[in-house]
């Protein structure tokens, strides 16, 4: 057979498993954030709730244009303006997701300036955080 290449089944399985884990992580983070935003937009004590499109995959040209317009890597995922005048800022991660160095810098700057920001790993966690900020129970 000369030039034939045979791949080990375990090798192929591990590649597929890694790709599946990446996909599931993205889906899970998307679902957590989507569910939270749906909840937030139904609450009377939340005036405004919006997402920042930092996770959006764009062509290199589009990404360059977005950066020139002010897109800043590391900005948290969702901002909620509450009726008490405070912001509740949420970075969503899965159970295994990690905060990037850029995200840590931005989160630290927000905390240094007395902004309520949290990394939440579930919709429930984000809901509790926002309620704590609104009720004055979240102390920076």
Task: Tell where the protein language model's regions lie, with residue ranges.
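Catalytic phosphate/metal-binding cores of nucleic-acid and nucleotide-processing enzymes, i.e., regions
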Residues: 1-140
